[in-house]
């Protein structure tokens, strides 16, 4: 069978690499892909942009694609799944209406309130004055979010009132995030530990993936601006079996039932970004309608189930008949980024030192890379993800940093403490 994966990041390289392990899969087309997917056995890049819905549909028809997996959020919010359904093509992802869970933060907060799903107290604003009055009344720290999609960067955690006021003015007057910031959500600052809780949903049944923890801030010890993610590890020890059960009962099931009850049944990967507070109460910070990036990379390293079979079961509404199996080892992925990221950065720098042979339990997934005249060059802010398995998070971390050490280009940087919370827990034991 032929498979299509939509996207060009590290997440799509990891999904493609995993899908290629299915013996019945002949070719996995990646649209548009990157230098890593171009080199991966069974994978082939196709020059179609993720926003080109008509082009993707035409290609899937032409190649008789039997499964399409959507990586990024943009095509979901544009309705790629609806278009494939109309053409009678099998695709795993939420419809345009269901993708509002990620596409609009205001929609999500109102949805959570309607279904009594735990989240931070909040208010939505389109005008500057009432928004400023609200933050002055609430005080800092407080969180200001652009309503629409802002590539994971439209969230300002304001530690002072001045920062909050500046963020509101930027988003509502200066329009720092374009269309995404024409409405803001202001919410209480939650204290606790974050976890990424990703599940597969077929409309009613839910299959949990491995837990993970992402590192959003650009700098060590969680300093500097938010990014799309600088590294992740799996499993996340903060999600104990008891908390796992609470998340399923208090967050995931009510979300899936609520979406179905409102006429937007949810099919696809559903990612709940959670804050686990001191007494183990999970609160929803955000939803993503897709697998996380970079969480996908360490999670796929641990996945022992067949990803293609799971996606096909979900499309057939049979997720209750399959199970997910995981390598008991820990996995960690470290993002290698271009100097300047998440602000302006260089493109076109030649990358050297990429591993020539695959070693069990180690993998460099490509994100912002392209082939130029026989060289692999940088083509994005997050360029590569050095990923490794280990018997503990500290062992996985050591292997991943050893792998990262061999790779270089002008201006490359990475965080040096990915996994620090889990490692602190291991050391306490």
Curated annotation (Swiss-Prot):
Gene3D superfamilies found in the cross-reference section: 3.40.50.20, ATP-grasp fold, A domain, ATP-grasp fold, B domain, Phosphoribosylglycinamide synthetase, C-terminal domain
Binding residues annotated for Mg(2+), in chain numbering: 286, 288
Enzyme class: ligase
Ranges annotated as biased composition (Basic and acidic residues): 213-223
EC number(s) stated in the UniProt entry for this protein: 6.3.4.13
Listed GO MF terms: ATP binding; metal ion binding; phosphoribosylamine-glycine ligase activity
Pathway membership, UniProt: Purine metabolism; IMP biosynthesis via de novo pathway; N(1)-(5-phospho-D-ribosyl)glycinamide from 5-phospho-alpha-D-ribose 1-diphosphate: step 2/2
Binding residue positions for ATP: 135-196
Substrates-to-products reaction catalysed: 5-phospho-beta-D-ribosylamine + glycine + ATP = N(1)-(5-phospho-beta-D-ribosyl)glycinamide + ADP + phosphate + H(+)
InterPro entries linked to this entry: ATP-grasp (IPR011761), ATP_grasp_subdomain_1 (IPR013815), PreATP-grasp_dom_sf (IPR016185), PRibGlycinamid_synth_ATP-grasp (IPR020561), PRibGlycinamide_synth (IPR000115), PRibGlycinamide_synth_C-dom (IPR020560), PRibGlycinamide_synth_C_sf (IPR037123), PRibGlycinamide_synth_CS (IPR020559)
Keywords attached to this entry: ATP-binding, Ligase, Magnesium, Manganese, Metal-binding, Nucleotide-binding, Purine biosynthesis
HAMAP family associated with the record: GARS
Protein name as annotated: Phosphoribosylamine--glycine ligase
Species annotation: Vibrio vulnificus (strain YJ016)
């Amino acid at each position: 069978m032929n498979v299509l994966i939509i996207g060009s990041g590290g997440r799509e390289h990891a999904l493609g690499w995993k899908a290629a392990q299915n013996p019945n899969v002949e070719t996995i087309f990646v649209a548009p892909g990157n230098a890593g997917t171009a080199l991966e056995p069974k994978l082939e890049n196709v020059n179609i942009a993720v926003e080109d819905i008509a082009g993707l549909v035409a290609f899937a028809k032409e190649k008789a694609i039997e499964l399409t997996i959507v990586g990024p959020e943009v095509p979901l919010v544009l309705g790629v799944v609806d278009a494939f359904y109309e053409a009678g093509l099998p695709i795993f992802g939420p419809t345009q209406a269901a993708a509002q869970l990620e596409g609009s933060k205001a929609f999500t907060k109102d949805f959570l309130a309607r279904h009594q799903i735990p989240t931070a107290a909040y208010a939505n604003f389109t005008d500057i004055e009432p928004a400023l009055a609200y933050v002055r009344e609430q005080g800092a720290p407080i969180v200001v979010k652009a309503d629409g999609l802002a590539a994971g960067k439209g969230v300002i955690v304001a530690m002072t009132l001045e920062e909050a006021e500046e963020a509101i003015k930027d988003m509502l007057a200066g329009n720092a995030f374009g269309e995404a910031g024409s409405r803001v959500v202001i919410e209480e600052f939650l204290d606790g530990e974050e976890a990424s809780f990703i599940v597969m949903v077929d409309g009613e049944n839910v299959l949990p993936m491995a837990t993970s923890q992402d590192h959003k801030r650009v700098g060590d010890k969680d300093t500097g601006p938010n990014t799309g993610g600088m590294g992740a590890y799996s499993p996340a020890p903060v999600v104990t079996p008891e908390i796992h059960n609470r998340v399923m009962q208090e967050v995931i099931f009510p979300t899936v039932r609520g979406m179905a009850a409102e006429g937007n049944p949810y099919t696809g990967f559903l990612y709940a970004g959670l804050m686990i507070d001191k007494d183990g109460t999970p609160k929803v910070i955000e939803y993503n309608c897709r697998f996380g990036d970079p969480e996908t990379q360490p999670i796929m390293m641990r996945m022992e189930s067949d990803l293609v079979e799971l996606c096909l079961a979900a499309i057939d509404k049979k997720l209750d008949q399959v199970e997910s199996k995981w390598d008991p080892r820990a996995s960690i992925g470290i993002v290698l980024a271009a100097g300047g990221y998440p602000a302006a950065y260089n493109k076109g720098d030649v990358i050297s030192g990429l591993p020539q042979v695959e070693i069990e339990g180690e993998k460099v997934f490509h994100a912002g890379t392209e082939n130029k005249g026989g060289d692999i060059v940088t083509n994005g802010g997050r360029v590569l993800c050095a990923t490794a398995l280990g018997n503990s998070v500290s062992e996985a971390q050591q292997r991943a940093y050893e792998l990262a050490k061999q790779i270089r280009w002008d201006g490359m940087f990475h965080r040096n403490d990915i996994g620090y919370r889990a490692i602190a827990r291991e050391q306490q034991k």
